[in-house]
Amino acid sequence: MKLGIVIFPSKMIQDKANGLRKRYDPHYALVPPHITLKTPFETQDEQLESIVNELHTIASKTNPFTLHVGKVGSFAPVNNVIYFKVEKTPELTFLNEEMHSGFFTQEREYAFVPHLTIGQGLSDAEHADVLGRLRMKDFYYEQPIDRFHLLYQLENGTWTVHETFRLGKGNN
């Protein structure tokens, strides 16, 4: 089974991202806009309970925090992904580190850059054009975050929530 761990932003932020993703992200229909805490990973069904228990522990050690989303960035030239930048708070960093150490041993492919993808799979010319236009616009959003989600991938490639984890002591 394939799992991933994400934070979903507010509906307002998702709507803004989806307005762009419809045009620039081929994965638009597979998963709602999100901030990835742990990239998708394969696991055996019998490990799911242990993963859920570990995520409850991580959530209980993390205080709710404010998510700051603003400006447009890109991972070019590594890949042509365009995204809304997400401020790297101590809580986001802690969550990401906890999900890549101890119980979770998956190696990182890239350094942790919190972001909300709005375009990917673009040609070099399209990437440059879209990025140039979006960088001229003013984007800034903030919202309180008090939970993250364990997702699993269905056979048709879409992702759905398996369980939600509330941040802070006594919330799980």
From Swiss-Prot:
Sequence motif: HXTX 2, positions: 115-118
Enzyme class name: hydrolase
Keywords tagged on the record: Hydrolase
InterPro entries: 2H_phosphoesterase_YjcG-like, Cyclic_Pdiesterase, YjcG
Pfam families per record: 2_5_RNA_ligase2
Enzyme Commission number(s) from the entry: 3.1.-.-
Residue interval(s) of motif HXTX 1: 34-37
MF GO annotations: hydrolase activity, acting on ester bonds
Keyword Oxidoreductase: no
Annotated catalytic residues: H34, H115
Keyword ATP-binding: no
Alphabetical list of NCBIfam families matching this protein: PRK13679.1
Protein family: Belongs to the 2H phosphoesterase superfamily. YjcG family.
Protein's recorded name: Putative phosphoesterase BALH_1087
Organism of origin: Bacillus thuringiensis (strain Al Hakam)
